[in-house]
Amino acid sequence: MRFVIVTGLSGAGKTQAIRSLEDLGFFCVDNLPPTLIPKFAEACYQTEGKIKKIALVIDIRGGKFFDDLFESLKYLKEEGYKYEILFLDASDEVLIKRFKESRRKHPLSPDGRILNGISMERNRLREVKDRADNIINTSELATRELREAINEIYGEQDQIENQLVITVLSFGFKYGIPLDSDLVFDVRFLPNPYYIKELKQYSGKDKKVSDYVMSFDVTNKFVNRLEDMLNFLIPNYFKEGKRQLIICIGCTGGRHRSVAIANTIYEGLKSKGHKVNIDHRDINEDIHKGGKKL
C-alpha cells in the first residue's frame, strides 16, 4: 500500500495536489485530524489490498490537533506502516499574492496580517518539512505543471498514459444534445438508412445498416478526417489536464447513422490503446417520440 501524507503551507497548492492524486486512483481524505491517522491506517491495511493508495491532507487547519502529527507518525513507524510525506511550499511573495487574490484570511493571522500568519505557519511546519520525502515548491508552477509534478512522483507510467477516459456517445438531435458533451459532430449530412425500407427497422449496430452507412465515399472521408482531428486533440486535451472526454455523434433520431459512426470511432480509438467507452443514448427511442433527454 502507498500511504501519502500531504501537508504544507496554506495557499501552496494542497487542494490541487490532492485532486491530482485522486485522479491517479488514490483514496483521498482532506483535513483528517492527525490523532485519527493510526486508526485510519489500520482500517485501510485491513482491507487486504482493496485499498492500495491512500492520501491524507494534514495541515494547521486542525488547530491543536496538528501537534499530534508526530506522535501519530511515530506510531505508524513502530507498527510497520510505511508512509510518505509530500510537502507543498511557496515563497512568501507568492503566498501573499494568492491570499489577496482569493480574498481569504490566513488561518494563523487573526489580526489580518497575512505575512505574520505565513511566518507562524513556517515555524510550525519546519520539522515536518525536514522529514518530508518529497518537497514541491509551487511558486513558479501553473496548475498543469503541479499536476505533472505529482504524476511524475506518484503516477505509474501506464496509468498516466491511459488516464484520459473517453466516451463516444451517439444521440438523436430530436431528443436534445447531451448536456455533458465536449465535442459534438452532426452526421445528418450522410445518406440515411431510415428511408431504405429493408433497413429502417434495424439500427446502426446491425451490420447491414453499418455497411450501408460506411459504403459511401463521403462517410469514409468524414471518418478519416474526424479520426485525424481526434488524434491531434486527445493528447493535447490530456496535456492541458483534461481527464474525461465525451465525443457526441448526432443524427436525427439517434438510431442509424450516428450509431454506425460512433461504433466506427470507438473501434478506432480502442485499437490505439485508449481507455474508451461507447453509449447509444437514443437507439431504442420511438422514432416519432418527442421530448428532451439529458
Curated annotation (Swiss-Prot):
<dbReference type="InterPro" id="IPR027417">
    <property type="entry name" value="P-loop_NTPase"/>
</dbReference>
<dbReference type="GO" id="GO:0005525">
    <property type="term" value="F:GTP binding"/>
</dbReference>
<dbReference type="InterPro" id="IPR053931">
    <property type="entry name" value="RapZ_C"/>
</dbReference>
<dbReference type="Pfam" id="PF22740">
    <property type="entry name" value="PapZ_C"/>
</dbReference>
<feature type="binding site">
    <location>
        <begin position="8"/>
        <end position="15"/>
    </location>
    <ligand>
        <name>ATP</name>
    </ligand>
</feature>
<dbReference type="InterPro" id="IPR053930">
    <property type="entry name" value="RapZ-like_N"/>
</dbReference>
<dbReference type="Pfam" id="PF03668">
    <property type="entry name" value="RapZ-like_N"/>
</dbReference>
<feature type="binding site">
    <location>
        <begin position="59"/>
        <end position="62"/>
    </location>
    <ligand>
        <name>GTP</name>
    </ligand>
</feature>
<dbReference type="InterPro" id="IPR005337">
    <property type="entry name" value="RapZ-like"/>
</dbReference>
<dbReference type="GO" id="GO:0005524">
    <property type="term" value="F:ATP binding"/>
</dbReference>
<keyword id="KW-0547">Nucleotide-binding</keyword>
<keyword id="KW-0342">GTP-binding</keyword>
<comment type="similarity">
    <text>Belongs to the RapZ-like family.</text>
</comment>
<keyword id="KW-0067">ATP-binding</keyword>
<protein>
    <recommendedName>
        <fullName>Nucleotide-binding protein CLJ_B3680</fullName>
    </recommendedName>
</protein>
<comment type="function">
    <text>Displays ATPase and GTPase activities.</text>
</comment>
